[in-house]
């Protein structure tokens, strides 16, 4: 930009400072959420939740699919896909194998659930959109919260539908 004659060295410094000041709160929120949910995972919080949920469904295929959705929704509260897969897949894949369910169904349900939770204010897509719009991520999230609630209902419905398909498959 400098060598092309668009900006001077002084302007580049101002642009960098402006960029950091506008994205700083977003970055801080993201770092906090990753650290917090990482600590909660290491502390075994999700193991307790998964154990309690699986006691409810036992060998019900539709129930396992719904629990997969709920676990993915809880696991994706941090907005990070990698951590969600580290929670959902190790917990649910043995159950799916034991019940002769397809691993693709596990992934499909998890990804649908994760897509809905990507609207959380600390998730990457919402933070980027808020930064571009020049508003706080929480303010943006409040406007899309009803859409997210509908998305959660649709994710649960998709889990039930996938469970019915798996049940018919045998």
Residue ranges and their predicted role:
Residues 1, 81-88, 105-109:
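Hydrophobic alpha-helical membrane segments of integral membrane proteins
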Residues 1-4, 32-38, 68-75, 147-162:
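Hydrophobic core segments of alpha-helical transmembrane domains in multi-pass membrane transport
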Residues 2-3, 15-23, 141, 157-161:
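Proteins with a high burden of low-complexity, intrinsically disordered sequence enriched in S/T/G/P/A and R
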Residues 2-4, 27, 65-66, 114-124:
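Small-residue-rich segments of transmembrane alpha-helices in multi-pass membrane proteins
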Residues 3-4, 43, 133:
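Short glycine-rich loop/turn motifs that provide flexible caps or phosphate-binding loops at active sites
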Residues 4-6, 170:
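Short loop/turn hinge sites at secondary-structure boundaries
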Residues 7-97:
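Membrane-embedded alpha-helical segments and adjacent helix-loop junctions characteristic
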Residues 94-170:
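Membrane-core helix-loop-helix motifs of multi-pass transport proteins
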């Amino acid at each position: 930009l400098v060598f092309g004659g668009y900006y001077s060295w002084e302007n580049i410094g101002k642009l960098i400072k402006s960029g950091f000041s506008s994205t700083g709160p977003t970055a801080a929120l993201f770092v906090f959420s990753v650290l917090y949910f990482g600590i909660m995972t290491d502390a075994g919080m999700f193991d307790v939740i998964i154990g309690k949920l699986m006691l409810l469904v036992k060998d019900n295929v539709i129930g396992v699919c719904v629990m997969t959705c709920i676990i993915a929704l809880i696991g994706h509260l941090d907005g990070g896909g990698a951590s969600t897969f580290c929670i959902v897949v190790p917990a649910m894949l043995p159950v799916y194998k034991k019940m002769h369910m397809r691993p693709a169904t596990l992934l499909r349900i998890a990804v649908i659930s994760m897509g809905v939770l990507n609207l959380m204010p600390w998730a990457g897509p919402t933070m980027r959109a808020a930064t571009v719009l020049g508003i706080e991520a929480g303010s943006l999230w409040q406007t899309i919260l009803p859409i997210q609630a509908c998305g959660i209902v649709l994710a649960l419905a998709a889990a039930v539908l996938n469970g019915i398909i798996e049940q018919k498959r045998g």
